[in-house]
Amino acid sequence: MPTVLTPPLSAKPRYTLLDGLRGVGALIVIIFHFGEAFSTGWQSQMMNHGYLAVDFFFILSGFVIGYAYDGRWRNGQMTARRFMLRRFIRLHPMVVLAIILGAAAYILQGCVRWDGTPMPPESVVIALICGLLLLPAIPYTMMDVRGYAEMFPLNGPQWSLFFEYIASIFYAIFLHRFSTRWLRIFVIISGIGLAACTYANFSGGYTMGYGWSILGWDIIPCGGLVGGLFHVSFCFGIGLLLTRGFKPRTGIRGSFWICSALLLAVCIAPYITPDGDISMLNATYDLLCTFIILPAIVWIGANGVTTDRFSTAVCENLGNLSYPVYIVHYPLMYLFYSWVWTNSIT
C-alpha cells in the first residue's frame, strides 16, 4: 500500500476569507480602544464587547495553525524548533516595532505614571528590554512604568502576543500529539477554568490576561495570569478541535459579509445589566459568545468562499494589515488618551 504524504504547506489553499475576518477583528479592537478614551465605566463603552475580538483571534489562530501544521507533524515534516522559528519570524518583528513606538510615546508623554509620578530613565530602558523579550512587567515596580499593573505597559495589547506564544509552545510540544478525544478533554477543562475565572473576577466580563497577578483576581479585578491562560487554552484549543476531521462544505456565498456582520453584532452589543450596575449576566453573555458563537463564525468562514473581486480584494487587504495594525496601534492610543484627558474632552 503506497504511503500517503501530506502536501507541503505552500500547497494548501490559503484561507483568504479568514484573513479578512482577522482584519475585521483588528478594526473592532481599534474602535474599542478609541472609545475607551470617552468611557466612564464598563457599561458605557463605544464598543462594549470589543475585547471579544481577541477571543476570535485566538480561536482563528488555533484553527489556522491546526489546518496548516497538524498533518506535517504526523509525517515528520515539522519539528518544534522549526515551528517556533516560523512563529517567531511571523510575529516578533512587529512586536519589536510596536514596543519601540510605545517607548517613544511614553517619553513624549513625559515619562510619568497615570497619577503623575515621574519615572527614572532606567525604568523606561528596563520596560523596553522586557517588552522586546516578551517578559511581563512585575506590577508596582520600576518595570510597571504606567502604574496600571499591565503585563506590557509600553504596549498594552502585547499581552495577547504573550499568550499566543505560550499557546504556540504548548502546541509544538503537546497539543499536536493529542488525539481528538484528549484535545476535547483539554478544551472542556479549559472552558471550566475560564468560566470559573470569569465569574470570580467580579467585573461582569472576562477581559482577563492583560494584568499580571497570581490568582487572576488579586491585583486588578478584570485581569490575571491564570485567567489569561484559561482564556487562550480554551480559545486556541477549540480552534484546533474545529480542524479535526474538518471537510469544507460547499462554499457558503457571501460568508465574509455574513461573518463580519455577526462578529460586529457580538462586539457592539450593549453591556447586559438589569439595573445599570456591574452584572454577571454580562459575564454569561461573554462566555456564550466564546463557547458557541465565535467558534461558529470561524466554522462558517472556513466553509465560505469569496465569489467576486471586490470581496476578495477586501479580504486580502484586511488580512495583510490585520496583525501590523493590531499590534502597533496602541502607542498612538496612549498619546490620544493623554490629549483627550488633558483637554477634558468628552
Question: Can you name each region flagged by the protein language model?
Answer:
Residues L18, F83, L91-M94, S160, ...:
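Alpha-helical transmembrane segments and their helix-entry boundary regions
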Residues V24, G35, F57, F162, ...:
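Active-site His/Glu-centered metal-binding helix of metallohydrolases
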Residues Y51-V54, G71-V112, T117-L134, A167-S168, ...:
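Transmembrane alpha-helical segments and their boundary/interface "anchor" motifs
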Residues L91-Y165, G193-C222, C289-A302:
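Membrane-interface helix-loop-helix regions
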Residues P2-L17, L27-G50, G66-M78, P139-A149, ...:
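Alpha-helical transmembrane segments in multi-pass integral membrane proteins
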Residues G20-G23, H49, L161-Y165, L229:
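Hydrophobic alpha-helical transmembrane bundles that constitute the permease/transmembrane domains
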Residues L21-H33, W182-F202, I258-C267:
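Small-polar-interrupted transmembrane alpha-helices in polytopic inner-membrane proteins
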